[in-house]
Amino acid sequence: LPVKSLRESREKLEGVARNTKPWKSLLKFAPLDTRYPRPTAQDLALLLYTSGTTGAPKGVMLTHRNLEANARMGEEWIQPGNDEVIYSVLPLFHAYGMTLGLSISMICQARLVIFPTVDIDLMLKAMKKTMPTILPAVPPVYRRLLDEAKKRNISLQGIRYAVSGAMNLPHELV
């Protein structure tokens, strides 16, 4: 990995869980066995959980078509180029992180840089090597990022799209 602290974090991760197969070995068997039906656009792809802003968090059933439609919407908004870099600091188990991080990066064929947690220091170090062109985040992350970048005299001009969600974006951050 290009950033030392990311390399060190990866090295601290535990080894392969028992009874799992390495990803590369799974790729050899990519075609689905004919005994199993191929998933359709209407089939359940995953359960994502809401943040509970209107009550208790809920598990939302999303189909393959839902995921693709959300990613395609993002693609239409952003009109990606050939060299997009998306920083993913949002949890992938929520719709916002899944859609504007993981799903859109696949649709747009963008490079996806996933951060294990919101770590402004780590993000700014990574930006010295690879500036994101797309940064989906929440207002508190933008506030901290702007404050720290200003203190350290780091330009954020390479970010073409800073997509905000989950709460109101204060006018002073726009």
What does each model-identified segment do?
Residues 1-41, 149:
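ANL superfamily adenylate-forming
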Residues 45-69:
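Conserved AMP-binding A3 loop
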Residues 53, 109, 166:
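Conserved G/P- and acidic residue-centered "switch" motifs that form tight phosphate/ATP-binding loops
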Residues 68-85, 93-134, 144, 148-150:
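Conserved AMP-binding/adenylation subdomain of ANL enzymes
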Residues 1, 58-61, 88, 110-117:
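Short beta-strand->loop structural element characteristic of the AMP-binding/adenylate-forming
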Residues 41, 82-83, 158-159:
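Phosphate-coordination loops involved in phosphoryl transfer and adenosine-cofactor binding
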Residues 44, 50-53, 86, 92, ...:
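Conserved S/T- and glycine-rich ATP-binding loop of Class I adenylate-forming
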Residues 27, 90, 118-119, 132-174:
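Adenylate-forming
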